[in-house]
Amino acid sequence: MQPLIEIEAMTKVFYTEEIETHALAGVHLTIGRGEYVAMSGPSGCGKSTLLSIIGLLDTPTAGKYELNGRPVENLKFAERSRIRNQEIGFIFQSFNLIGDLTVAENVELPLTYRSGMASSYRKSRVQ
């Protein structure tokens, strides 16, 4: 069976005028469909950077990344957004609900950006 996530020789470098920070260097990772994976390590070791790339919020400096068998390095912004909306879920360590919305409205919000989903169906999913 094809891996859900396959990363080969991934590198991520952050640049400023004076400093070059290597956040990831030669990362190899394969995650199968239905597999549970935990990442741990000290602050600054690259966990958040790797997860941001896996979640299509950032791009690697070098290396190969395939999600469901398709290369994602060169996807346009709109396609990356569509995949994030329909195929990837995020659970943040610190969450920020929108204070002017109810809890149900906060839960429903991501579904409003999913095309073709009727309001009544969204509300039923939230409940």
Mark where each language-model region is.
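A short, flexible loop at the N-terminus of ABC-type nucleotide-binding domains that lies
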Residues: 1-4, 13-26
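ABC ATPase NBD coupling module
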Residues: 18-21, 72-89, 119-120
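The feature captures the beta-strand-to-loop junction immediately N-terminal to the Walker
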Residues: 40-42
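Short coil-to-helix "N-cap" segments within the ABC nucleotide-binding domain's helical subdomain
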Residues: 76-79, 105, 114-127
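Conserved ABC transporter NBD signature motif
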Residues: 63-71
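Short coil-to-helix segment of the ABC ATPase nucleotide-binding domain corresponding to the Q-loop/switch region
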Residues: 101-110
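Helix-to-loop junction immediately C-terminal to a conserved catalytic motif
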Residues: 55
